[in-house]
Amino acid sequence: AASDVYKRQVILAAVIYFYVNHQYSSYEVKNTIALKKSSGMKCSAYQNGVLRYSRDGAAAVDRDGNEMWNGSYDMENPALDICEKYAVVADIQGKSLYVYNGSDSGTKLTTDYPILQACVSKQGVVAVLLEDQSSNVIQVYNPYDDNKKLLVEIPTNVEEGYPVSIDLSPDGTGVICASICVTSGAVKSQVAFYDFTDVGKNTNCLVGAQEYKDRIVAEVKYLDEDHATLFSEKGFSLWKNMKKPKQVFKKDWNREILSAFYDDRYIGVIAAGSKKGSGRMYLFNTSGGKVFERQVATDFTNVTMADEEIYMVTTEGCKIYRKNGVETVSYTHLTL
């Protein structure tokens, strides 16, 4: 009996090993979706389908090509943000944005100042970074509340620097803002953490701040309601407990950072290697533990992560890596 149990364990281990290390050598086209071309059209993964947006509108289709929703608008420079079924398209340097709830034609919001960035939460709450003449402003809206659309307004001043990146928590209750400021000829970054619940009501919503004199924080991102990451030209840092933010991990590289990617469980970085055209891919969990490190080519144009897989679009095709670092797909001259 013991030997039978051992055999089953060996077989199970072999099956698991085969699954996590299997490399595919071919593919089958399950479906082809024709997208109507328009000026400056861009696409993004959305709800197991595709969301396309351009200067004149946005639309989402499922994996079978069935339209889920569409909406029209007129924008010069549309930018997209997605959180679960909600999406926001904002006209950068314009004053309009549209919020989509996954089934309607969009709800319009108009701002008083030019838009620099917009983010959406899983409830449809939107945070917008606006450019005023004397200072920048962060405004948080509920587009579906007819009585009080503007929920919070956070002014910034010259002393705090020029905001370059904001992000809204998935539950819509917090914002992180990274700013750049120049003091006595030296450039530094300041990161502010805001909370709109009762936790932050006695401090004008500010629950944490961090100054960096040795790096420029270019992007901030919530991984979930309680974890966030800050990306700089040197590396990244991990923060937890967004009601009382605390840095729990920091990783720097002495080589150029070529790309960074993430999902709600992992953070990845590709740094330049010692040879031209070669790089190192690193994957970390939200505690800062290194999951894997491996060599990759640097001919990629985009890197994203979803469903615990890393998708790398290259100049000639695509590559897919599992979270253990195994390359499962490698296609060149990919044509569908």
Question: Model-derived features: where do they sit?
Answer:
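Solenoidal tandem-repeat scaffolds enriched in leucines and small polar residues
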Residues: I138-Y141, N147-L151, P155-R215, K221-L223, ...
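Non-cytosolic head/periplasmic domains of membrane-anchored proteins
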Residues: I82, Y86-G174
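Structural motif
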Residues: S96-Y98, S135-Q139, S184-F193, G235-W239, ...
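Conserved small/polar residues in nucleotide/adenosyl-binding loops
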Residues: A2-Q9, T332-L336
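A short beta-strand motif characteristic of beta-propeller blades
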Residues: E28-A34, N66-G71, D104-T110, K149-T156, ...
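Beta-strand-rich domains and repeat architectures in extracellular enzymes and scaffolds
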Residues: K30-D56, S72-L80
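Short beta-strand elements that form the blades of beta-propeller/WD-repeat-like
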Residues: K42, Y46-Y53, K85-D91, G124-E131, ...
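Repeated scaffold domains used in trafficking and secretory/extracellular systems
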Residues: S38-K42, E76-I82, Y113-S121, E160-D167, ...
